[in-house]
Amino acid sequence: MTASLANYLSSLVWAAVIVVIPAAVALVLISQNDQMYRK
């Protein structure tokens, strides 16, 4: 694996982490709020 390929893959991983984790947190918070509203 070349250095540029490794950098590309690591940037993809970090982009996924930056996008997926906040999205997952937001979904959890929204679902919890929905349950509260339904009660």
UniProtKB/Swiss-Prot annotation:
Pfam families: PsbX. The keyword Mitochondrion does not apply. One of its GO terms (cellular component) is plasma membrane-derived thylakoid membrane. The keyword rRNA-binding does not apply. Gene3D superfamilies: Single helix bin. It comes from the Bacteria. It is a single-pass membrane protein. Keywords: Membrane, Photosynthesis, Photosystem II, Thylakoid, Transmembrane, Transmembrane helix. It is found in: Cellular thylakoid membrane. InterPro entries: PSII_PsbX, PSII_PsbX_type_1_subfam. One of its GO terms (biological process) is photosynthesis. The chain crosses the membrane at residues 10-30. Its main location: membrane. Belongs to the PsbX family. Type 1 subfamily. Involved in the binding and/or turnover of quinones at the Q(B) site of photosystem II (PSII). PSII is a light-driven water plastoquinone oxidoreductase, using light energy to abstract electrons from H(2)O, generating a proton gradient subsequently used for ATP formation. PSII is composed of 1 copy each of membrane proteins PsbA, PsbB, PsbC, PsbD, PsbE, PsbF, PsbH, PsbI, PsbJ, PsbK, PsbL, PsbM, PsbT, PsbX, PsbY, Psb30/Ycf12, peripheral proteins PsbO, CyanoQ (PsbQ), PsbU, PsbV and a large number of cofactors. It forms dimeric complexes. This is Photosystem II reaction center protein X.
